[in-house]
């Protein structure tokens, strides 16, 4: 009988299509699939494709009202993971029409919205996404990008230096502003609100913004350099967030900050649009990322969150350090650092990059190295991250035995010494400690650090 038949059927009959030629407009995903015992990998891969696109658990008569061939996700390739028992990489292609233009929120809802709780899978991890130009062009992307930021700040040929103001909670606004001033006066380019500083009883946001702006202008006048403080605009509602961003602009602040995962992509994209329209730089913190990306076999790899952020919009994003207190492997980290900064990134599995990604001149995002780093790490950081980065020393600045400003001086001297040594052709990896020692002869602040 040709007619409609109800009943449960295998996904792989419809959604596993190994001979499919991927289109240039498809969004491609690489999933790490761990099927339940007894579930063949093709069925598991097809189930992922189905549940994250057009499928449901049974045949429904309304399937006849649409063209599945046009709209279904397809699992087009499966490979076993070397060295892992019962783990596979399933490659899925999604037709562009499944996604709303300019909405990271909708893209993630579709691709990772429902399928991660699926019974046939023991675990599932989204390792990488290929965003086609046809889709990325519907996004504004970062408000300004790397070159525009350098021109705004008038700082070239070196990484930028930042510092998170500690203790992160408990300072009054006036004392907070004082710490900001000391760090900037000492030689840092930026200071930063901690990600959990929003507007608490001991320091309301407006007071903090005012004192930080005062610190900025004073440090700028005394050093002749442009300074910034990441004013955290993250709030409980989008309206309140925008209110804070507007106030930052009225104070003449150059940069605001947002926690993009806890704040959400919808809020983040709105803020990014405001920042471009009003000449504010946007610093992005990735609070909550480890909840999503730390498990090796379940969740989402940070490189996906990084790509999503570049589409949603941000000028800086925290991306691990390779050397500090938080986890991050060197090649993998450099992989997503390139995905953030570069225009065109070749597929390279050794760096965790599953697809060639062409951003077609979408502005880049500056990676921020932050967390447990101090002056002895400076040569390594300069070498690993290169010029287009922000190196952030929190305790590494404020923990200086002589105080905040000397701590800032020590960091700036160390950075300038490393950049000069690199430009003279010296090997930072080998001679790093020696370079820092030489510099400390001329800088008592660095010697004390």
UniProtKB/Swiss-Prot annotation:
The keyword Disulfide bond applies. GO terms for molecular function: magnesium ion binding; monooxygenase activity; ribulose-bisphosphate carboxylase activity. Mg(2+) binds at residues 192, 194-195. It holds the Pfam family RuBisCO_large_N. The modification N6,N6,N6-trimethyllysine is found at residue 5. Its main location: plastid. The disulfide bond which can form in the large chain dimeric partners within the hexadecamer appears to be associated with oxidative stress and protein turnover. The record marks 325 as: Transition state stabilizer. PANTHER family: RIBULOSE BISPHOSPHATE CARBOXYLASE, RIBULOSE BISPHOSPHATE CARBOXYLASE LARGE CHAIN. RuBisCO catalyzes two reactions: the carboxylation of D-ribulose 1,5-bisphosphate, the primary event in carbon dioxide fixation, as well as the oxidative fragmentation of the pentose substrate in the photorespiration process. Both reactions occur simultaneously and in competition at the same active site. The basic functional RuBisCO is composed of a large chain homodimer in a 'head-to-tail' conformation. In form I RuBisCO this homodimer is arranged in a barrel-like tetramer with the small subunits forming a tetrameric 'cap' on each end of the 'barrel'. This is Ribulose bisphosphate carboxylase large chain.
């Amino acid at each position: 009988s040709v007619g409609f038949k109800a009943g449960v059927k295998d996904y792989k009959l419809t959604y596993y299509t190994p001979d499919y030629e991927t289109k240039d407009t498809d969004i491609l995903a690489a999933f790490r699939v761990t099927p339940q015992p007894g579930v063949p990998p093709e069925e598991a891969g097809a189930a992922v494709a189905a549940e994250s696109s057009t499928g449901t658990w049974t045949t429904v008569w309304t399937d006849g009202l649409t063209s599945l061939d046009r709209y279904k996700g397809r699992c087009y390739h499966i490979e076993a993971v070397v060295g892992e028992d019962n783990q596979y990489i399933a490659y899925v292609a999604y037709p562009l029409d499944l996604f709303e233009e300019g909405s990271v929120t909708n893209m993630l809802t579709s691709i990772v919205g429902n399928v991660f709780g699926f019974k046939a899978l023991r675990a599932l991890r989204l390792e990488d996404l290929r965003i086609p130009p046809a889709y990325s062009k519907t996004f504004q992307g970062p408000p300004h990008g790397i070159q525009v930021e350098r021109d705004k700040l008038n700082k070239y040929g070196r990484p930028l230096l930042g510092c998170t103001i500690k203790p992160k909670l408990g300072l009054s606004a006036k004392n907070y502003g004082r710490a900001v001033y000391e760090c900037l006066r000492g030689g840092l380019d930026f200071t930063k609100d901690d990600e959990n500083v929003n507007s608490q009883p001991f320091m309301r946001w407006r007071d903090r913004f005012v004192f930080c702006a005062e610190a900025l202008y004073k440090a700028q006048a005394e050093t002749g350099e442009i300074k910034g403080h990441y004013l955290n605009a993250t709030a409980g509602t989008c309206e309140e967030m925008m209110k804070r961003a507007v106030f930052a602009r009225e104070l003449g602040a150059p940069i605001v900050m947002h926690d993009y995962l806890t704040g959400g992509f919808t809020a983040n994209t709105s803020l990014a649009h405001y920042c471009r329209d009003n000449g504010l730089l946007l610093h992005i913190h990735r609070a909550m990322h480890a909840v999503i990306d730390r498990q090796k076999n379940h969740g989402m790899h940070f490189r996906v969150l990084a790509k999503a952020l570049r589409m949603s919009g941000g000028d800086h994003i925290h991306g691990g350090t390779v050397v500090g207190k938080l986890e991050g492997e060197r090649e993998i980290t450099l992989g997503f650092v390139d995905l953030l900064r570069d225009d065109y990134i070749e597929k390279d599995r050794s760096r965790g990059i599953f697809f060639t990604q062409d951003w077609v001149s979408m502005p880049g995002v500056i990676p921020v190295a932050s967390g447990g780093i101090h002056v002895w790490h400076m040569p390594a950081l300069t070498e690993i991250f290169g010029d287009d980065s922000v190196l952030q020393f929190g305790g590494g600045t404020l923990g200086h035995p002589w105080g905040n400003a000397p701590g800032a001086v020590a960091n700036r001297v160390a950075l300038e010494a490393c950049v000069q040594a690199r430009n003279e052709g010296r090997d930072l990896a080998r001679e790093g400690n020696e370079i820092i020692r030489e510099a400390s002869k001329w800088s008592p602040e660095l010697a004390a650090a």
